[in-house]
Amino acid sequence: MIFTARRRGSSPKFQVFNTALITALSDMTQAESLADREFWGRLTESAVGAHLINASAGGTCEVFYWWERNREVDFVLRKGKKLVAIEVKSGRTTTSLPGMESFSKSFKPGRMLIVGPGGISLERFLSTPVEYWINGAER
């Protein structure tokens, strides 16, 4: 799914509902998974996506991703008129987030969250109900 001001065709983003299948098929140990930055990044983003999709299945919100040209936002939550942009980072802290900046200029989300180093810890994000992040309980 894609969230834009105008409708246009795009390839859907593949999202698993449970990361167990990915890890089982990878045939990697936890240490190997952590050492492989690309794999760990996909796994981390998939875990966040599964958490958000499960919330959307319960009616909490709608979940999208946003991509325009070479800029993207990993996840966009919409509940009524509220928008929340979420960028997932699994490596080092990032100071430049051009996708978030571009999305913010175009859509003025109520919140922009970074999950991972320099933002909300992955453990905290996954153990907190999605409603908490939508309703702006923490700024």
Model-derived segments and spans:
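Accessory nucleic acid-recognition modules appended to NTPase machines
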Residues: M1-V73, L77-G80
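Hydrophobic/aromatic beta-strand patches that form the interior of the parallel beta-sheet core
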Residues: Q15, V84-I86, L113-V115
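Switch/connector loops and helix/strand junctions flanking conserved nucleotide-binding motifs
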Residues: A24, T95, S121-F125
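Arginine/glycine-rich "motif VI" loop of SF2 helicases in the C-terminal RecA-like domain
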Residues: A55-G58, S102-G110
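Nucleic-acid nuclease catalytic cores
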Residues: E68, F107-L126
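Active-site ExK catalytic segment of metal-dependent nucleases
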Residues: K81-R92
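Active-site-adjacent loop/helix micro-motif of nuclease/hydrolase catalytic cores
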Residues: R92-M100
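Domain-level recognition of nuclease-like catalytic cores that cleave nucleotide substrates
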Residues: G119-R139
